[in-house]
From Swiss-Prot:
Residues 50-56 are annotated as: Required for binding D-type cyclins. This is Cyclin-dependent kinase 4. Phosphorylation at Thr-172 is required for enzymatic activity. Phosphorylated, in vitro, at this site by CCNH-CDK7, but, in vivo, appears to be phosphorylated by a proline-directed kinase. In the cyclin D-CDK4-CDKN1B complex, this phosphorylation and consequent CDK4 enzyme activity, is dependent on the tyrosine phosphorylation state of CDKN1B. Thus, in proliferating cells, CDK4 within the complex is phosphorylated on Thr-172 in the T-loop. In resting cells, phosphorylation on Thr-172 is prevented by the non-tyrosine-phosphorylated form of CDKN1B. The active site is at 140 (proton acceptor). Residues 6-295 form the Protein kinase domain. The keyword Methyltransferase does not apply. It comes from Homo sapiens.
Amino acid sequence: MATSRYEPVAEIGVGAYGTVYKARDPHSGHFVALKSVRVPNGGGGGGGLPISTVREVALLRRLEAFEHPNVVRLMDVCATSRTDREIKVTLVFEHVDQDLRTYLDKAPPPGLPAETIKDLMRQFLRGLDFLHANCIVHRDLKPENILVTSGGTVKLADFGLARIYSYQMALTPVVVTLWYRAPEVLLQSTYATPVDMWSVGCIFAEMFRRKPLFCGNSEADQLGKIFDLIGLPPEDDWPRDVSLPRGAFPPRGPRPVQSVVPEMEESGAQLLLEMLTFNPHKRISAFRALQHSYLHKDEGNPE
C-alpha cells in the first residue's frame, strides 16, 4: 500500500530511527505515525526486501493479533521507493501525542503522585512482559519511546526495530544515550531480556526524580555513576568476556536508594534495587516485578 494514502500533517521528530511524521488517514480520520527506513535491496523473494527485514516485520504483524493495550500498534507496512542498492520502507504506527518525557515535564510540582507512578509502572511492565514472552528484547527503552495517551494508557514504541534499522543506523551515525543502558551492554557482553529491566529501573527512578538517574558521558563514566549507587559488584558477578576489567573501578559500597530517590517508599526502593541488579541472571523479570508487593499496595479497583 502506498503512503500516498496518508496525508502528512507535521514532522514529529528525528531520532536514531530517522524522521517520524504525523499523518492522517483520510479513510478513517485517524492520525498515524509514519517511520521510514532504508534497507538493503535483497533481491529475490519478499519483493527485494532482505529476509531479516521480512522476518522482523512478520513478527511485528503477528503481535498485532493480540492487540495488547500497552504496545503501540503497527497498522501498515509499505515499500515506497527502491533503487538497485536499497529500498525505502515506511512503517505506519498508531499515533500517540505525548511520550513519557513530555508527560513528566507537564506534571506540576512536586511531580506525579505515587499512585499514578504505580499505575504507569504496572502498564509499562505488562507491555514489556508481553514483548519478552514473545522473545522480543526492546534494547532501547527510554522515556522518549514510552508513549502515554491522553487517557493515561502507556504504550511501548520502537520495539523490534533494532535489526530492521541496523543498515540505516550504520549509514547515519547518531549519538544514542547511554543513560538507560544495562551494565552488560556498556561492557559489550552478551545480553538478553534483562537489559530491558535495567532500563525500567532507571525510568522508574526518573518518574520520582523528574530527571535521569545516571548521566554518564562514556561507557566507563556511566558504569562509574552506576557503581556510586549500587556499589562495585563482586568479582563473581563480573562478566568474563569483556575488555574492561573490574579493577578499573575503585572499590565502593552501595548507597541507600533514598539518597537519590528520597520520595520512594521502602518497598519501591526494594523493587528498584531488584531492577538495578548488576548480574542480569539475578535481575528481576517483568513478570516477577508485576507480582511485587509495591505494585499491589493501595491498588485501586481491580481491572
